[in-house]
Amino acid sequence: MCLFRQARRFVLAFTGVMAAQVPKLEPPVLAELSQELQRFQVGDQQLWEALVQDTARRPQELKPLDIVYLLDAFRRALSFGVRPAPALEATCQRIMECYQDFNSKQCTGALGSVCRLSGHIDSSQQYKVMHLLLGQWLASQPAKWETTPSNQVISVAVSLSGLGVLSDRTETFLAAASSWALRWGAPEGGALSAEDLVVLLWSLKEMTPLGLARYRELVQLSLVRIRAAATYEDWTLVRQGQALEVLLSAKHALVEDGADLAVAEELLLGIEAPMTAVAS
């Protein structure tokens, strides 16, 4: 017990010294430190509080990559009981000042964190930040998204699915993402796996009041791929649930748009049976 107490005192003293050094660190080092603390699951409250307060004190020094790292770390540190609200507010304000400096990958990362911080960021600030980052991401893409990484498209789609309020930029993304998927993602040998297609269709469904009806061609093409290549038993429960939601929405989309019912029903039945068997 004596050794345990000595070890605990040493750890507390060590983290106390580290916390005292935080204000002296340059922002890139601060951001890297936040990632390392998260990576090794260091939940020391004193150290995290120092990171929160220092980030809130000098947000104007943060560059896009620093912001991406810090947002990700603070979001994950919520599981330690960290309360990062002051840092999040200051960081979001900084994004609104420097969003044009973000590259495509950095926009994707920041969107992924901001969308998951509902309840910890003011809703109006959250919407403004996501709106600006989405606009910057769209402006960074090549014509027809020919060389846009598929994981970025999927990530942005998932991030936007919880936005709730559609805007002109969201509509631009929806149209471009569905066209991109038809051209590069869904065809046999395309950039998207069966699981990716489920995630994309689910995200499009969540952002579209009429579900998947407006994406009938993409639905038909995707269902063929999903039926042929999906390994439902390897998917998480969340993914299986999304797949069932997509299947239900696909039924309405194919029927309401006047697709050939016999072909559509055969395709849907071929997916529904194994999917529901695994989910149950």
Regions found by a protein language model. Give the residues of each.
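Eukaryotic RNA-binding helical-repeat scaffolds
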Residues: 1-280
